[in-house]
C-alpha cells in the first residue's frame, strides 16, 4: 500500500536504488532522533522523576515547589511511626530507583537505616533538609528542644516543620535540592519557592490572628513531643506524656497531670501513630477535650491550622 502511494510521487529509479535505505535505515534514524533530548536539556514528565523522602510532610514542601513536575514517595507510609518503622525490600527498591533521597535528620527511621542507604546506593544524592534550619535563623528553635520553660519533659525533637521558621527552612532545602538536581528548570523552581513561602506566611498570619485575642490556650498535653517548635514559636507550653521516648511511669503521669492542671490545660492532642489510651485517660482526669491531630500528614497547611484552631477553641 505504502509503495503504491509513493510510486505516484517518486521515480522508478527510487525503487531500484533507494528503497532499501528508505525502508530500513530511515525508520531507524527517525526512532533514534525522537529518543534524543532537546538541546539544553529536556523537561521530563513527573513519571520520569522520582524523589524519595522519609515522611509525608516532606512531600508537601517538594510538591508545592515542583507542581507535579516530580513524583515524591515517602518511605514511611502514612499512619506509621517513623521512630519504629522498618522498611520492606519493596520500599528500599523504590528508594534505589529515585533520583535523590531527602531526609529530615534525627528521626528513628533515619538513624537506623541511613548508613545502609548510603552503602547500598553510593551514587544516590542525599539531602538533609534539617541543615537549612541554621540558614533560616532558627538557633532559638534548636534551643527550644530542651527549653523546659516552653517544652516540658522530653528529649530532642526533630519535628522542624511544625513551626513557620522550620517550614521556611524545609522550603529552602527543597528548593536548593531541586535546583541542584534539575538546573535547567530553575525559573520554575524560583516561582514555586516564592509561591510556597507566600502560603507559609499566610498560615503564620492566620495563626497569629487566632492567638491575638488572648482567649487561646497557653499550654497543651500531647503523647509524643511533635509540637516543640510550634510551642516555641507561639509562646506555648507543651506537656509530654511520653518519658524519654518510652512508656511513662506512674510517677511521670502524675507529674503530667499536676502540670496540666496548674497550667489550666483544656486540650489534649491525640496522635494516631502513638498509643492513645493514656492521653485519653489524662483528658478525662483533668476535664480536657481530646483532639486528634496528625503532624505526619502531607497537608502541612491544613494540619497547622487545625492545631491552632483547637488551641484557640475555634470549631
Give each language-model segment a name:
Residues 1-17:
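N-terminal secretory signal peptides that target proteins for export/translocation
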Residues 3-5, 21, 25, 35, ...:
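N-terminal compositionally biased, intrinsically disordered segments and leader/signal-like regions
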Residues 12-13, 17-37:
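Bacterial N-terminal signal peptides
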Residues 35-315:
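Extracytoplasmic metal-acquisition and chelation regions
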Amino acid at each position: 500500500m505504502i509503495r503504491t502511494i509513493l510510486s505516484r510521487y517518486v521515480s522508478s529509479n527510487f525503487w531500484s536504488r533507494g528503497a532499501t535505505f528508505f525502508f530500513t535505515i530511515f525508520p531507524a534514524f527517525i526512532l533514534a532522533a525522537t529518543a534524543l533530548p532537546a538541546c539544553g536539556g529536556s523537561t521530563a514528565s513527573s513519571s520520569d522523576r522520582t524523589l524519595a523522602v522519609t515522611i509525608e510532610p516532606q512531600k508537601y514542601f517538594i510538591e508545592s515547589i515542583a507542581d507535579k513536575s516530580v513524583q515524591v514517595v515517602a518511605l514511611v507510609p502514612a499512619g506509621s511511626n517513623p521512630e519504629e518503622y522498618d522498611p520492606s525490600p519493596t520500599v528500599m527498591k523504590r528508594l534505589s530507583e529515585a533520583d535523590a533521597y531527602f531526609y529530615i535528620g534525627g528521626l528513628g527511621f533515619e538513624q537506623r537505616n541511613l548508613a545502609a542507604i548510603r552503602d547500598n546506593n553510593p551514587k544516590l544524592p542525599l539531602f538533609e533538609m534539617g541543615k537549612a534550619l541554621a540558614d533560616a535563623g532558627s538557633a532559638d528553635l534548636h534551643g527550644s528542644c530542651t527549653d523546659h520553660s516552653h517544652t516540658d519533659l522530653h528529649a530532642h525533637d526533630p519535628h522542624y516543620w511544625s513551626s513557620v521558621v522550620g517550614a521556611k527552612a524545609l522550603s529552602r532545602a527543597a528548593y536548593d535540592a531541586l535546583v541542584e538536581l534539575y538546573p535547567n528548570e530553575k525559573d520554575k523552581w524560583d516561582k514555586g519557592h516564592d509561591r510556597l513561602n507566600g502560603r507559609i506566611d499566610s498560615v503564620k498570619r492566620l495563626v497569629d490572628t487566632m492567638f491575638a485575642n488572648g482567649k487561646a490556650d497557653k499550654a497543651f498535653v500531647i503523647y509524643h513531643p511533635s509540637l516543640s517548635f510550634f510551642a516555641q514559636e507561639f509562646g506555648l507550653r507543651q506537656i509530654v506524656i511520653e518519658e524519654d521516648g518510652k512508656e511513662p511511669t506512674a510517677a511521670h503521669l502524675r507529674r503530667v497531670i499536676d502540670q496540666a492542671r496548674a497550667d489550666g490545660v483544656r486540650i489534649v492532642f491525640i496522635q494516631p501513630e502513638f498509643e492513645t489510651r493514656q492521653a485519653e485517660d489524662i483528658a478525662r482526669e483533668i476535664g480536657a477535650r481530646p483532639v486528634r491531630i496528625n503532624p505526619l500528614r502531607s497537608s502541612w497547611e491544613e494540619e497547622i491550622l487545625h492545631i491552632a484552631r483547637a488551641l484557640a477553641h475555634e470549631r
